[in-house]
Amino acid sequence: MSEQLPLLIELGTEELPVKALPGLAQAFFDGVLAGLEKRGVAVTRGDAKPLSTPRRLAVLLPGVATEQPEQRSEVLGPYLNIALDAEGKPTRALAGFAAKAGIDWTALERTSDAKGERFVHRAVTPGAQAAALLPEILREAIAAMPIPKPMRWGAHEYAFARPVQWLVLLFGDTVIPAELLGVRGDRITRGHRFMHDGDIALAAPGDYIDALRAAHVLVDADARRARIVEEVDAAARQAGGSARISDDNLEQVVNLVEWPSAVLCSFERAFLAVPQEALIETMEINQKFFPVLDDGGKLTEQFIGIANIVSKDVAEVAKGYERVIRPRFADAKFFFDEDLKQGLEAMGAGLASVTYQAKLGTVADKVARVAALAEAIAPQVGADPVQARRAAELAKNDLQSRMVNEFPELQGIAGRHYAKAAGEPSEISLAIDEAYQPRFAGDDIALSPLGKVLAIAERLDTLAGGFAAGLKPTGNKDPFALRRNALGLARTVIESGFDLDLPKLIDVGLASLPDAVKPHADRNTETVRADLYDFILDRLKGYYADKGVAATHFNAVAELTPASLYDFDRRIDAIGIFATLPEAEALAAANKRIRNILRKVEGEIPGDIDTTLLREPAEEALAEAVEAAIGDTGDALHRHDYVAVLARLARLRPQVDAFFDGVMVNADDPQLRANRLALLKKLGDRLGSVAAIEHLSS
């Protein structure tokens, strides 16, 4: 086994794209490791990970073998009867084989197999030096990096994410003499652009992280992240509040700085009259600042900026940040004030001139459909239908507001504020906001009954219209986000415990569409309904998989196509509990056997069991047990207590096992055969009343 040495590779660049930086760092790291592995060079990875700052991408590995392992090869040659003539001299076949191997035939070895003895060429080739392999490995790694917009600079023909300024290639204490992207490898790196003068000569790779830290560079993104959180929290406590640190904002800031330093800033209290969501949006999205909240979660007039330098005059840095934010806040206040003057209801007039989709009419048309759906759904879930209609009629009006035009992410949120200002009931203003929930994967569903109704109605219209208009997603194309809408609808129904009949709701949604896209003879309501139902179930499959539900459990319930998604969920829970019972596997296998037997039956199976035709003790016992189980589970089925149903059915296992062990189903006597099939059908129907449990059979 060859010696291992630490390896350091650093590409020093101009400032790299913030959003692309994590992906570039990971791809560079993975590419180097893959190149070493492909060539059989042993690596001790330890806790190594991608290292990066806005000005560098680095790979630091604690141990890399100095050379490849020996390469052993074996090439089989001709058999002796072909290789040697009668005098034992080499034939042309053997001479050619030896020449191809590059040795004299007398140096060849011999081996035997079932056909006889033959010549073989065995060779041991020394492994290549890792230092000689690294330049090509790096070129491959760089070529495979996901660079969004490659740049060219100077007179060079090559391209990279940003111009490369320096290159560290240090293997042990030795520089690898190679050139990449127009720069020769060296041991010289650079510190912070403003806080460190001069180059840094590295004696060995192990010096890298500490040497850069001394030069005011935290090359580990995790270290920068921890420092930012620590400093931001401390600054917020100093202001008497707590910082809002969103993951997205934090990641952006981590990749903007090399030596983060928190700066506490403030703005005029008058701006707090603007909805805080707009101010937070401005701070986080536009400026990458961290808002400071009070104990009640309300925005204060303080915020925190992250400088890429420890300034001697922090107050001056704060003033600069405050100068930047002030005009943006002034714009937001202007938009808000102007919108209030117009009023939420008046904004809706413009929706009639905005096309929602060519076949589905204007946004105003969509609003009317959603309002009708909301009014129809509300009484089914205990919400006020009048308020549901009113909330739906106002829910899209803020799309015409100046605020949403500037901050699209505030749709619904802005509407809530404008509805409140207009004196609408709090239930309506909240529902206008909650109609958009869940806004993204992992987001909460709406909390209020009215918000849930609007969320369901909005998504139902979007899905019904999309499928009727032929907009079903294909591949990566989903311009109307039908996949997200399907999951949002399903989650809202299930997590709210709403026992709604989905096929009937789909029919209502389809019936309200424009005549041009309504189901017709060539593609009737039943076809569109089934297509959309299956689409929603397909989204649910991923939802349950994320929750750890086995695919077999999902398929067992899906086969029954429950009309209610909430009922679907209860069946999923019940089948999960049933699967843990010791009787589950045997009953699942039995039900599978029953299905296979009944599938082959020609003609009608009797609906009732004739007790006078029960000949065997095992079939008598099973018939009695099945009738008892049907009687015991009827009420539980009616109450949707599926756990109780399956627990009771599990007690049938002894009788089921005894029946299949001792009774011939396909008896010669047609009356006996028909009666036994009737017994199996009754048993199978009840075993499959909660889910197609045969899916649990391995």
UniProtKB/Swiss-Prot annotation:
EC number: 6.1.1.14
Enzyme class: ligase
Subcellular location field: Cytoplasm
Record-linked InterPro entries: DALR_anticod-bd, Gly-tRNA-synth_bsu, Gly-tRNA-synth_heterodimer
One Pfam family from the record: DALR_1
Residue stretches in coiled coil: none
Catalytic activity: tRNA(Gly) + glycine + ATP = glycyl-tRNA(Gly) + AMP + diphosphate
Keywords: Aminoacyl-tRNA synthetase, ATP-binding, Cytoplasm, Ligase, Nucleotide-binding, Protein biosynthesis
A Gene Ontology molecular function term of the record: arginine-tRNA ligase activity
Principal subcellular localization: cytoplasm
TM annotation in the entry: none
Listed GO biological process terms: arginyl-tRNA aminoacylation; glycyl-tRNA aminoacylation
UniProt KW Nucleotide-binding keyword: yes
Any single Gene Ontology cellular-component annotation: cytosol
Assembly, per entry: Tetramer of two alpha and two beta subunits.
Entry similarity comment: Belongs to the class-II aminoacyl-tRNA synthetase family.
Protein name, entry field: Glycine--tRNA ligase beta subunit
Taxonomy of the source species: Bacteria, Pseudomonadati, Pseudomonadota, Gammaproteobacteria, Lysobacterales
Gene, per the UniProt record: glyS
